[in-house]
Amino acid sequence: MSKKASILVIQGPNLNLLGTREPDVYGKTTLEDIHQKLGELAKAQSVDLSTFQSNHEGELIDRIQKAKQDGVDFIIINPGAFTHTSVALRDVLAGVAIPFTEVHLSNIHQREEFRKHSYLSDIANGVICGLGAIGYELALQAAIARLQR
């Protein structure tokens, strides 16, 4: 990588409640813990990492649009419940054409029927689900490897 790579981690609705919300489904790790670990891993690889969480679809869309202006090279996104409902998130991700990985803490395919469909997965570079918080670390490793090609 000639310039320092820039990776944005986007967290959707209710992920600010990690650690306390349904820990049997999502684990006990907090969002702050996840972001801290990712920051350490990114720093060790000389990668710029920024994070953003919102419970509001429009704010997520605005941040993704800004990512294009900011020159972000890769996005890691856990869209939360918007995975199953948001054509608008799909459209903005397709529109900015920044490669991205979709991450889910739980295995969405083992859950309720309505959670089994993702509006994003067919345009994502990859999907990681069901591995808990380590899924974010794997997504970061994959993003860095892709950017180093």
UniProtKB/Swiss-Prot annotation:
Residue numbers marked as site, Transition state stabilizer: R21
Keywords carried by this UniProt record: Amino-acid biosynthesis, Aromatic amino acid biosynthesis, Lyase
GO molecular function: 3-dehydroquinate dehydratase activity
PROSITE patterns reported for this sequence: DEHYDROQUINASE_II
Matches recorded under SUPFAM superfamilies: Type II 3-dehydroquinate dehydratase
Reaction equation(s) it catalyzes: 3-dehydroquinate = 3-dehydroshikimate + H2O
Residue numbers annotated as active site: Y26, H104
Enzyme nomenclature, EC number: 4.2.1.10
Binding site for substrate: N78, H84, D91, L105, S106, R115
UniProt-listed InterPro entries: DHquinase_II, DHquinase_II_CS, DHquinase_II_sf
Functional pathway: Metabolic intermediate biosynthesis; chorismate biosynthesis; chorismate from D-erythrose 4-phosphate and phosphoenolpyruvate: step 3/7
GO biological process: amino acid biosynthetic process; aromatic amino acid family biosynthetic process; chorismate biosynthetic process; quinate catabolic process
Top-level taxon in the UniProt lineage: Bacteria
Subunit note: Homododecamer.
NCBIfam families reported in the protein's UniProt record: aroQ, PRK05395.1-1, PRK05395.1-2, PRK05395.1-3, PRK05395.1-4
Its biological purpose: Catalyzes a trans-dehydration via an enolate intermediate.
Family, per entry: Belongs to the type-II 3-dehydroquinase family.
Protein name, entry field: 3-dehydroquinate dehydratase
Source organism of this protein record: Polynucleobacter asymbioticus (strain DSM 18221 / CIP 109841 / QLW-P1DMWA-1)
Phylogenetic placement of the source organism: Bacteria, Pseudomonadati, Pseudomonadota, Betaproteobacteria, Burkholderiales
Gene giving rise to this polypeptide: aroQ
